[in-house]
Amino acid sequence: MEAGIVEAAGMDWEAFQTVAWTLVKIMALVVPLMLGVAYLTYAERKIIGWMQVRIGPNRVGFQGLLQPIADAVKLLMKEIIIPSGASRALFILGPILAIAPALAAWAVIPFSDGLVLADINAGLLYVMAITSMGVYGVIIAGWASNSKYAFLGAMRSAAQIVSYEIAMGFALVGVLMASQSLNLSAIVQGQAGGIQQWYLWPLFPLFVVYLVAGVAETNRAPFDVAEGESEIVAGFHVEYSGMAFAVFFLAEYANMILVAALTTLMFLGGWLSPVAFLPDGIVWWLLKTGFVLFLFLWFRATFPRYRYDQIMRLGWKVFIPITIVWIVFVGGMMQTPYGHLFH
């Protein structure tokens, strides 16, 4: 009997260690991500300020470096006001459903060779499935607010996200054909051999479609009709305040970094060095992801907001046909002597 008790205690201790280690790894991923989100807002204000010949944040800390911390403290101190006609439970559930997929998707993102929380073979499929759930948070937030502005913004956002997910999915089919794997680490390893081996070159139209569709997916300018200030105040989160509003903000920027990271992994060689004489590593992943994020901010500073009908037309009549044509072209070329150019 004593032996059985000791064995059970040993199993419990092993289970506890496994759970504790998993929680440590999750925190090691989430904490830097939240810091990255905070300082992406700072970078956005600084970079767009520089493009518009302004200074940007410069009051809190050296060169305004503590501005994100000040913003977080301000939002934490504000009251979360629930409108009188709102559905209380769904109103609170909306931000949770928005942030959860944005964080959960990071479980399968590899930062370097072997540096990944969960290296699963269906990583690409997992990311596509989990990120598509973010739209439920948007719809619930808009509907539960009991506001016409919020509901209109939610409907716009939901239609836009669903429309551009199709183009993004087709773009990923091209990557899947080239790498012949759904494992994100294997997709990166398939681009080994320098910058000339990146999938950016044979799949360039799919790269452009994926990048622009990613901007639309995250409701960023110039595709931010869901929160068009001049038309419907602030979109689906118009009734939110305090930390509930901040959670939507975090979800948007976490999704931005996620799209940039996926673009890096699938088209720009991930953590692989572009030249043979420099070693691979997480530094390359950070530099490439930072470059894609810079493009996101550059788009915002450059382009005016599109009309809703223009956004829908671009998604359905331009991007989806381009991706289908290029997938057929790549599939056909793979059956010819030039097929090695697409692997």
UniProtKB/Swiss-Prot annotation:
Tagged with keyword Transcription: no
Entry membrane topology: Multi-pass membrane protein
Pfam hit, one: NADHdh
Alphabetical keyword list: Cell inner membrane, Cell membrane, Membrane, NAD, Quinone, Translocase, Transmembrane, Transmembrane helix, Ubiquinone
Reaction equations catalysed: a quinone + NADH + 5 H(+)(in) = a quinol + NAD(+) + 4 H(+)(out)
EC annotation from Swiss-Prot or TrEMBL: 7.1.1.-
InterPro entries membership: NADH_UbQ_OxRdtase_su1/FPO (IPR001694), NADH_UbQ_OxRdtase_su1_CS (IPR018086)
A single GO cellular-component term on record: plasma membrane
Subcellular locations according to the entry: Cell inner membrane
Transmembrane spans: 19-39, 89-109, 124-144, 158-178, 198-218, 257-277, 279-299, 314-334
Single GO BP term: aerobic respiration
GO molecular function: NADH dehydrogenase activity; oxidoreductase activity, acting on NAD(P)H, quinone or similar compound as acceptor; quinone binding
Subunit structure, interactors included: NDH-1 is composed of 14 different subunits. Subunits NuoA, H, J, K, L, M, N constitute the membrane sector of the complex.
Protein family membership: Belongs to the complex I subunit 1 family.
Entry function: NDH-1 shuttles electrons from NADH, via FMN and iron-sulfur (Fe-S) centers, to quinones in the respiratory chain. The immediate electron acceptor for the enzyme in this species is believed to be ubiquinone. Couples the redox reaction to proton translocation (for every two electrons transferred, four hydrogen ions are translocated across the cytoplasmic membrane), and thus conserves the redox energy in a proton gradient. This subunit may bind ubiquinone.
Name of the protein this chain belongs to: NADH-quinone oxidoreductase subunit H
Native source organism of the sequence: Thiobacillus denitrificans (strain ATCC 25259 / T1)
